[in-house]
Amino acid sequence: MTQLAVPSPVAPTFPDLVEIQRESFLWFLREGFEEELLSFSPIIDYTGKLELHFLPEYRPGDPSKGYKINRPRYDPEEAKRRDATYQAQIRVPTRLINKETGEIKDMDVFIGELPLMTDRGTFIINGAERVIVNQIVRSPGVYYKSELDKNGRRTYSASLIPNRGAWLKFETDKNGLVWVRIDKTRKLSAAVLLKALGLSDSEIYDNLRHPEFFQKTMEKEGPYTEEEALMELYRKLRPGEPPTVSGGQQLLESRFFDPKRYDLGRVGRYKLNKKLNLNVAESVRVLTVTDILAVIDYLINLEYDIGHVDDIDHLGNRRVRSVGELLQNQVRVGLNRLERIIRERMTVSESENLTPASLVNPKPLVAAIKEFFGSSQLSQFMDQTNPLAELTHKRRLSALGPGGLSRERAGFAVRDIHPSHYGRICPIETPEGPNAGLIGSLATHARVNQYGFIESPYYRVENGVVRKDLGMVYLTADEEDEYRVAPGDVPVDAEGRITADLVPVRYRQEFTTAHPTEVHYVQVAPVQVISVATSLIPFLEHDDANRALMGANMQRQAVPLLKPDRPYVGTGLEAQAARDSGMVVVSRTNGVVTYVSADEIVVRPDDGGDPIVYRLQKYQRSNQDTCLNQRPLVYTGDRVVAGQVLADGPATEGGELALGQNVLVAYMPWEGYNYEDAILISERLVYDDVFTSVHIEKHEIEARQTKLGPEEITREIPNVGEDALRDLDENGIVRIGAWVEAGDILVGKVTPKGESDQPPEERLLRAIFGEKARDVRDNSLRVPNGERGRVVDVRIFTREQGDELPPGANMVVRVYIALKRKIQVGDKIAGRHGNKGIISRILPIEDMPYLADGTPVDVVLNPLGVPSRMNVGQVYECLLGWAAEHLGVRFKLMPFDEMHGLEASRLTVEAKLREAREKTGKDWIFNPEGKYCGKIQVFDGRTGEPFDQPVTVGRAYMLKLVHLVDDKIHARSTGPYSLVTQQPLGGKAQQGGQRFGEMEVWALEAFGAAYILQELLTVKSDDMVGRNEALNAIVKGKPIPRPGTPESFKVLVRELQSLCLDVSVHKVEVDSEGQTHDVEVDLMADTSNRHTPSRPTYESVTSEDLSPSPAFTRVLRTADANASRSLEEDEDEEEEEDF
């Protein structure tokens, strides 16, 4: 493994990349859950006789105290196998006090079940791995903003936003008065609010820096007493109700000073103290009079240009809510419901017999937690396509979800990259489409602090010297604004002194330059700005951001291949990404390997403890149907150290991420087969399994209890030949190892059928012979259309074995089918620079363009895909990969290498190519002179002639993406129709048709293809009578009759009529005297027959009809010039026939 000649700064090892998930969940277990229980304790009944106390305080070192989590019933692997949830029971110590008798009852009460996090940062809910995405929301606190009215007068407003409770908004107007709105209600004078809080005039004026500004507001309202102010407050908030002083008092208390109704949260209190320079204790989570006065004071100061307004998109004002906090909020919802139930039970039951266990019902808490994990927008099915996808999913930041934004309301400002994102949120990795900017990814070195604000690490700089010896300092976006921060690629000498005269710095969100002695901090590494996926792109700085975004997103869609191959050109972050994803097995201790097999590794630790057994995953199915398989990397007798990779997982090789393959590419056009991003590949990629991947599909069937009796899993299936049952065992379940194709039976199942289900011929047989034909129907599980493969696993679940089954099911059988998918035309492949394309042709090896030594290239890419897309990084990568192959080394390049001098990338690549040329003695590898620098003479495989121009050839790292043509290709003959419009449904899952949209209609109109157009809009779509008649005509070999009225036209007419528009359809008829009459057509004439299913009738088909008629034979011979004429004659003959 050769390092580059240019010294790359060693990035400090990243923090643990899944830390954000694990730490947050641990906080919930240690503090969050306890905090919630304490906030509800004690629960007192309506008469005040009974009190129920929760005593969940966690005492480290004293296991008798605190709430207890029982051992989970299943381990994570078993939970996955059984489709169960990996969860544990929670028991909380409670105390019930009877005030009348003084009796005290203590006991541990079961309060509910809590899903536990696996060591990989995921949850297993009903057998599926899920991830709780981190939510980024506006932080509670006070926000000031300024607005210009239409006269150009500037007004200011302050919004006081709590964690939960009523909003308070103060605003100034053009007359210099201060108003307040409570929860967006009508305006109320701020003087009235302050008076209602019991403040005297002198107390108000003493606490303001500019009392003269507020005097106008006080004078306008007149001299209010506290009682009058409370009445006025009540009048404004509850118009229409008779105002009372006590009502006003209670309203004010409950809105802002009751901890149950109003909560600033720890963060809100911290932000409020910081912004307004207060020193209220952090435990005070409600508003105080001091807070309200300080908010008004700051607002008035803004009128005198003291202080500054806030930017709500600044990361100092947005915080991250991770798993722990989201779960805590959900527990609060459950405990609220529980509190109501406990109070009711206290009132209803006899107090002598009450125990804490009889009061506490675990259902509401269990339901709230289940709802959160099962259906919350932030609880997502884990993206398990490859290790990077899994890692990125756990580090995702979403602005959507409950309490966040919605796609429709989010404007440009929220989505935009903000200067404070620097080093905290990746400016590149975000989805394309409606979620752009709302979903981001945490930067590589960023971490979330105790308040939920994102911090980024820096080294301190003193007098122009970078002090790495002092360790890293983590700063939030707010703190960083006060300092001059230099980027991580500033040139420094051996002592750490900055060598440049002027350094680019960021200061107060501006990018400027400064002298080295003025710099306060310097970034830890150049990659700390970007996310993990983005930092895996080599030569990132030479790619346009839009393409880098696609490159980062497409790496997450790469399918793990059969033979993983590390990139020749990497960035050095592959190993850590693979390790933290949890897909590789890592040694926990130093020791010696004592046993290795395909499915387990045993290590004897050096400290003499028990041997550690590491179980490997073998051919498991991932959430995305890719194959999870781990392969041992160590041998018996090897010494291992803690943190060493013991076994590779999917898409990793040697403990490094290996998402794709290093293939030989040439940038040249080839017979138009790489027009518009299409890609031409060599047959070698198919034969050598270069881009072959394994996919595992799951098929499931339930045997249920029906009204007519139980369904049965059996081999005895009616009307099925022995051939179709050849792979089923005696129970009717397919054997492991069988090869199955579309339509084959996987599990035989028969369902009892009632009298009504029997066809007429069966009823006739029973009437004549009186025997019961076996009254069951075939309901077997079959391989779906377009799928095939080998059965790799069969799992049977029954109640007798103690499995939990869905209600009504007696038995569940699950069959897993694996298939090797070779690369084929229509598959999508891509590079790491956003250069994606569809395979258009697979060419025999001998026809591919070849090099001077006879090596055929693997992939031919279009050179026109580079200049307009501006992702030149792919060219650098392909040339450096070319040098790497000939030198027999792999390169690791940190992105942003310009710190080593101008054009460092180009000079490095050139130097390595020269070195390769000299070492191998092959002069044709690199041509350093002239305008063809870096290009090679390539020969046409078909003729052996050289191509006109030299061509860029090299080793590029290409990925096969999960968008495989096998999963997308789909055809429909007849199938389901939409109920209202009667048009075919859309989509593969619905067995749907292809949409013929308005633009396609325009195309046919432009060609004047009237009959094709008419068919497409009627008999092939929603003319119900016409399509049945057309099918009958085709079956009988007769000409297709004229189409009728489309159903959607009838729907349109009915909709217009429902808007009270008199719309009707008329036709002009001519009578025998030549007079024209206007006749209204009843489009709904056939509604009486609508309840019959729309399918063709075969009653009138005779055996003569089914033999190919001359008319039908003539239709097939379309080349015959007389065909059209003979069809017209046939039509005339058949007019009389009753269809």
From Swiss-Prot:
In cyanobacteria the RNAP catalytic core is composed of 2 alpha, 1 beta, 1 beta', 1 gamma and 1 omega subunit. When a sigma factor is associated with the core the holoenzyme is formed, which can initiate transcription. DNA-dependent RNA polymerase catalyzes the transcription of DNA into RNA using the four ribonucleoside triphosphates as substrates. This is DNA-directed RNA polymerase subunit beta. Coiled coil: none annotated. Belongs to the RNA polymerase beta chain family. Residues 1085-1139 are annotated as: Disordered. GO terms for cellular component: DNA-directed RNA polymerase complex. HAMAP family: RNApol_bact_RpoB (MF_01321). Residues 1086-1106 have a biased composition (Polar residues). Its EC number is 2.7.7.6. The lineage of its organism: Bacteria, Bacillati, Cyanobacteriota, Cyanophyceae, Synechococcales. Pfam families: RNA_pol_Rpb2_1, RNA_pol_Rpb2_2, RNA_pol_Rpb2_3, RNA_pol_Rpb2_45, RNA_pol_Rpb2_6, RNA_pol_Rpb2_7. One of its GO terms (molecular function) is ribonucleoside binding. InterPro entries: DNA-dir_RNA_pol_bsu_ext_1_sf, DNA-dir_RNA_pol_bsu_external_1, DNA-dir_RNA_pol_su2, DNA-dir_RNAP_su2_dom, DNA-dir_RNAP_su2_hyb_sf, RNA_pol_bsu_bac, RNA_pol_bsu_CS, RNA_pol_bsu_protrusion. Keywords: DNA-directed RNA polymerase, Nucleotidyltransferase, Transcription, Transferase. NCBIfam families: PRK00405.1 (NF001616), rpoB (TIGR02013). One of its GO terms (biological process) is DNA-templated transcription. SUPFAM superfamilies: beta and beta-prime subunits of DNA dependent RNA-polymerase (SSF64484). CDD domains: RNA_pol_B_RPB2 (cd00653). Residues 1128-1139 have a biased composition (Acidic residues). It catalyses: RNA(n) + a ribonucleoside 5'-triphosphate = RNA(n+1) + diphosphate.
